[in-house]
Amino acid sequence: MAKQKFERTKPHINVGTIGHVDHGKTTLTAAITKVLSLKGAAQFMAYDQIDNAPEERARGITIAIRHVEYQTDKRHYAHVDCPGHADYIKNMITGAAQMDGAILVVSAPDGPMPQTREHILLARQVQVPAIVVFLNKVDMMDDPELLELVELELRELLSKYGFPGDEIPIVRGSARNALESPSKDINAPEYKCILELMNAVDEYIPTPQRAVDQPFLMPIEDVFGIKGRGTVVTGRIERGKVKVGDTVEIVGMTNDAPRRTVVTGVEMFQKTLDEGIAGDNVGCLLRGIERTDVERGQVLCAPGSIKPHKKFEAQVYVLKKEEGGRHTPFFSGYRPQFYIRTTDVTGAIGLPAGMEMVMPGDNVVMTIELIVPVAIEEGLRFAIREGGRTVGAGVVTKILD
């Protein structure tokens, strides 16, 4: 089969399945590809293909993760499914596969379980914008009143963790019946729940603002002085766009207020550009800035769009020994390096009240105080390193200064 061209005609959305082990996340993922393949909008992927997920590395951490893609009439989706519970935690904290929305799979006979709660909490912490629920295995429930109770419990749980529990769509069905049905007719009754779910995902999960439409930000990777022209900073534009004549700020790595300057040139591969946009690797020539005024680890950004901070709260996953992490626990006051965007900054860790220590393999909320302010915002991912090796991964959940 010839490779199909990637059509940019539809908005592109990243989703993923979350929920307790054995509640049917992978079965549902396979069922979605099967049902949508009946109208040529996906390639069917069997359960085993999805379950046997390849490993990826993100921020120094190995994660098993399976990507599938499919389309609805309205959108193009990239969907992630992880085989193990630890893989989910690692994926959500490192943002290896970004989620614009999540499909929470709950087995109706079991109701919400510990990992259901943990995944909802994590989704809130890492700011997954929206959740749609698939209430699975309803064919195993005879009592409609029990189903109502499970739904009620789920809505309360979602509200407790800061999601709009009363509004969230809950679709009932059986992923296995859809997956195992021999029917080639997309209107077969077993497929109705999958189409209903995709409709809910289409309608309820908002289209994210594209990176290029957000305020300009570029982490500085390198600084050069060019004789007779001034100082050039290079990096990959994280969001927004930049063109000659734009006023920008240099933020972080100093206790002084951010410096303002004007971009007098934008280059890519030694060629001048009209404008650099999100995803481009560029060099920006800055007016009136000395080579010694800028350093790696700072960011170049739209004025006022991001502030430097020292103190924040973060959700952190600490690597196990087998993953190349620490062999021993650490305590409050532990001072590793925090790799934020392009550089390491030393900081001290504070543990929550009543928590003595953190063991390798733990997933915890902690406060972090850096020795210098850095451009930070909620949702920013970082790695924790010790002697150059990654010992943890985190995401900023709250700014504290």
Swiss-Prot record:
Name used for this protein in its record: Elongation factor Tu
Residues holding Mg(2+): T26
S-S pairs? none
Q: Where in the cell is it found?
A: Cytoplasm
One term of GO molecular function: GTPase activity
Q: Which domain of life is it from?
A: Bacteria
Ranges for region G4: 136-139
What's the family?
A: Belongs to the TRAFAC class translation factor GTPase superfamily. Classic translation factor GTPase family. EF-Tu/EF-1A subfamily.
Region annotation G5: residue ranges?
174-176
Swiss-Prot/TrEMBL keywords: Cytoplasm, Elongation factor, GTP-binding, Hydrolase, Magnesium, Metal-binding, Nucleotide-binding, Protein biosynthesis
